[in-house]
Amino acid sequence: MEGTLDEENLVFETTKGIKPIKSFDDMGMNDKVLRGVYDYGYKKPSEIQQRALVPILKGRDVIAQAQSGTGKTSMIAISVCQIVNISSRKVQVLVLSPSRELASQTEKTIQAIGAHTNIQAHACIGGKSIGEDIKKLERGVHAVSGTPGRVYDMIKRGSLQTKAVKLLVLDESDEMLSKGLKDQIYDVYRALPHDIQVCLISATLPQEILEMTEKFMTDPVRILVKPDELTLEGIKQYYVDVDKEEWKFDTLCDLYGRLTINQAIIFCNTRQKVDWLTEKMRSSNFIVSSMHGDKRQKERDDIMNQFRSFKSRVLIASDVWARGIDVQTVSHVINYDIPNNPELYIHRIGRAGRFGREGVAINFVKSSDMKDLKDIERHYGTKIREMPADLV
C-alpha cells in the first residue's frame, strides 16, 4: 500500500513561530552555496528543509525529524557550507554519524554542495589510515564528518583542534545516542566549546532520546513528525506469506522473474545470512553484491561505488545499509527477514522511492513473523497488504 501521506500534507510538531520558507532564495544563503544547491539538483526545499534550515543558519539548537528520503543529509551539507568561514582553515563543524558509510556520504555531499566555495571537508572513520587523518587535519579542514570513536581519537591525539568548532551535528541521532555510542558522543561533546550549537537530525526520535537532549541542548527548535504519521510517500508496501524459512529463496527467485527491477536492496538480519544468501544466489547464476560490517573498508567503498554507478544492480545487506545511504535509483527493497524492531523498518524501506520517486517494499513473512508485521503497522499507522499476483 502506498504511504498514507504525501509530503505536501505532512503534519509537523513544530516550535511556535517557525514558518516554512518555500524557496532556497529566501533563506539568506550566499550566492556560491545557493549555486551549489541548485547544481546538486534541488529546485525547491523539502518540507523538513523549509522548516529547519533557517533556524540552523541562525544559530539555534535544532531537533529535526522527517522520514527517510526527504533530504536530511543535504540539509546538513547546506548548513555546513553556509556556516563555515572559508578564510579560516580550522575545524568549525563536526558531523557525527553511526556508520562509516553515512559519514562518508555526508562528506561527499558537503564537498558537492560546497563546490563553488572551496570548502574542505574530511571523513574521519575507522578502517582507514590514522596517519592520513592526521596529515589531512594538520593541513587544515573546515568540517569533519566522522564516526564518534575515530573523531574522539583524533581529538585525544591533538590532531583535531576543537576551539573553533561552532556546530555539532548528530546525524541519525536515535542510533547515535543508543547504548553503544552514547558514551563516545559525550566524550566528544565535553571536548567542545561550552557555547556550541547542537543539531540532532533523524528519521525517528523515541521519547527517551528527546529527554536526553535536555542535557546538551539549549531551548531547541523542535520540528517533529508524529510517529503515527511517519509513513513513506510513494512507497508501496507488501508482504509475501512464506510457510517455511527455506521457501524464501524460491520466492526470491520467482520475484526476479516477475518484477521489473531498476536496482534493489535485499535486507537480512545477520551478517551470516547475508553471506549465505549471496553465495546461494551466485550459485544459481544471479549477479549480486553484498555488504555488511565485517568487510574491510576498501571493499565496502568499492561495493558502494559500484552500486552508485549502476555497475551493480542488486545488493544483499545487513542493517549497516539501512540508515542514510542516498542511492536514488533503488526501485525495490526486499526484507528477506523482517527487521528485529519496528524503527529499523522505515530506515530499510526508505532506500526505495528516494526524493519523491516511486518505490516498492516487499516483506517475506513466516507465520511466526505476523506479530512483528502487525507491530510495524501499528507503529507507523499504516497497512501492509499481501502482494498481488499481478504485480510487475
Swiss-Prot record:
Residues that coordinate or bind ATP: A66, Q67, S68, G69, T70, G71, K72, T73
Short motif (DEAD box): ranges: 171-174
Location relative to the cell: Nucleus, Nucleolus
Cellular component terms (Gene Ontology): nucleolus
Motif range (Q motif): 22-50
Catalytic activity of the protein: ATP + H2O = ADP + phosphate + H(+)
Record-linked SUPFAM superfamilies: P-loop containing nucleoside triphosphate hydrolases
Domain Helicase ATP-binding: 53-223
Residue ranges of domain Helicase C-terminal in the record: 234-392
Keywords associated with the record: ATP-binding, Helicase, Hydrolase, Nucleotide-binding, Nucleus, Phosphoprotein, Ribosome biogenesis, RNA-binding, rRNA processing
Swiss-Prot/TrEMBL GO biological process terms: rRNA processing
Record InterPro entries: DEAD/DEAH_box_helicase_dom, Helicase_ATP-bd, Helicase_C-like, P-loop_NTPase, RNA_helicase_DEAD_Q_motif
GO molecular function, one term: RNA helicase activity
EC number: 3.6.4.13
Pfam family, one: Helicase_C
Modification Phosphoserine occurs at: S87
Domain of life: Eukaryota
Domain description: The Q motif is unique to and characteristic of the DEAD box family of RNA helicases and controls ATP binding and hydrolysis.
Functional note: ATP-dependent RNA helicase involved in 40S ribosomal subunit biogenesis. Required for the processing and cleavage of 35S pre-rRNA at sites A0, A1, and A2, leading to mature 18S rRNA.
Family statement: Belongs to the DEAD box helicase family. DDX48/FAL1 subfamily.
Protein name, as recorded: DEAD-box ATP-dependent RNA helicase 34
Organism field: Arabidopsis thaliana (Mouse-ear cress)
Organism lineage: Eukaryota, Viridiplantae, Streptophyta, Embryophyta, Tracheophyta
Name of the gene this protein is made from: RH34
